[in-house]
Amino acid sequence: MAVRPILPRSVTRVTGLSERPVFFVTLNNEPQPALVVKGENKVGDDEDVKASVRWASKMMKNVNNPLVNSKPLMPEEWNVFKRAAILAFHPTSPQSRNLQNPGYLWIKMPFVANLSDADFVNEDATTNTSDVKEVLRKFLREQVWRDLGKVVAVDLFVCNLDRFDWENFDEAQGRGVTWANRGNIMFVGANVIGLDPYFADRGGDGNANLNKVRPGAQSGLEILRDPLKRPQFALACTRAVSDELYSRMGGRMQGQGQNRRQVRGEMAYVVIRTDDPNNPTLRIEREDVKDLFNPFVDEFLGGLNAGADELKRYLLAKKTKYARPVMGGYRNPNPAPAKSIPQGIQDRMNFLHW
């Protein structure tokens, strides 16, 4: 899906989140937003961040879903958007503060209709039974885990630690992966979509930067390079989702010492609807959640392997496309500035022997 330009006088409505720099932009009085505009934390040079955003999006788009398409705002687009957005919010609002923050690099992406996510925890850290049940229903589908495996293959390559954090992955135990951001596992209908593939918050060492010379993100790349690590990594990811749900179903405690109290009761079990007409409901005990997704390890692993293979084919095709033609033993000079794969991606490919 193409990302529409922000032209002068085209912005007719802007809404935004209060907790993070995310805005929804309506163009030309259309009935729904056309764009999402998001502020990414700057880590290093602006051009490095822009290259990383573009290439992370390209890879996820080709491996996972054509709706994934992120592009940095052009300066003229930023000016048009900011003028409209400033008028939409009170000067002391969180949205206005985000717009004035010089630490963000602003990107745009198409607005995806009917988008949902796997976040089941409220802002006050409480958990609703209905939200838990809905998330359980989503993760009890084989296709979800296969899609998620493909998304995570790209995440491993670009060092996106904002879905799963694998920095403490223990291959021997099949553990050590955490579900880093519940809201960053997103769905269009019953399918997982890998929006927001670039994550800079923990990339200060250059690991998340696709435009750098050093091949960073080595722990993630090692999982991609060694097929023997992948089954245990797949198990660790399914366990990460189980562990988070199991923990949150146990309620939440508040206060200290004698004043400590449970502000949300434990969910001993939940009953969910299923897609099976012969067994329309399923009772899930909290204790069973610990191993609930183990049967989906093979689906996640299949997606991970397929995603890695598709990513390799895509990048090798790009490498061939951008290579300068050779005639008479010499490379012809380019008639115009040459397109190229960022050095950081080439280094990652070399590390993976691609």
Task: Describe each model-derived feature in a short phrase.
Residues 128-197, 201:
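Conserved kinase catalytic-core segment
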Residues 9, 16, 34, 78-79, ...:
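General helical secondary-structure elements
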Residues 110, 122-128, 132-136, 140, ...:
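Catalytic and binding regions of secreted/periplasmic enzymes and modules that target cell-wall glycans
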Residues 1-121, 126-127, 153-161, 168, ...:
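Conserved ATP-binding subdomain of kinase catalytic cores across diverse folds
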